[in-house]
Amino acid sequence: MARYLGPKLKLSRREGTDLFLKSGVRAIDSKCKLESAPGQHGARKPRLSEYGLQLREKQKVRRIYGVLEKQFRNYYKEAARLKGNTGENLLQLLETRLDNVVYRMGFGATRAESRQLVSHKSIMVNGRVVNIPSFKVSANDVVSIREKSRTQARIKAALEVAAQREKPTWVEVDSAKMEGAFKRIPERSDLSAEINEQLIVELYSK
């Protein structure tokens, strides 16, 4: 399945919530009607079946983290093998992706931009260049911007925007040095309450 390259706001309207695919401090509900379907005169969304709700939740989370279907299913399988709550394990695995950590630290304005920074070899983990967006970051790993990439305007702009947002408690960032520490794996209470991971577990358990 190919990665979606179309309008980002359309995806958020389809899911009925801000997927954080656009940069900026304001939520996008001020720009578009999230309760309506995509399109200039989008009708209100029909009531979904139980399966429809489960599928929609999976699509929403997959799009938030920018993960393709096969990869997302693999994350679920890994989450199911781990001890504890499968849904919570799934979200924690997604949060440890390098592209997501780069975004959480504010080096990229969006996860898509952060993924690009990783792919273009602008990111280092513990002093070594890593260009795999799905690379798993561990607690206490240090993530930094490569020296030759520190003059990029988009990184500076992203850090300025990030300075206006509430910073995640599980990362520690030194904006001047353009580096941060991944202090710990986030708890479920740290993450968005708008995600209902149990629906995803129910979908894949069928």
UniProtKB/Swiss-Prot annotation:
SMART domains: Ribosomal_S4, S4. It comes from the Bacteria. InterPro entries: Ribosomal_uS4, Ribosomal_uS4_bac-type, Ribosomal_uS4_CS, Ribosomal_uS4_N, S4_RNA-bd, S4_RNA-bd_sf. It comes from Shewanella sp. (strain ANA-3). This is Small ribosomal subunit protein uS4. SUPFAM superfamilies: Alpha-L RNA-binding motif (SSF55174). GO terms for cellular component: small ribosomal subunit. Keywords: Ribonucleoprotein, Ribosomal protein, RNA-binding, rRNA-binding. It holds the Pfam family Ribosomal_S4. The keyword Coiled coil does not apply.
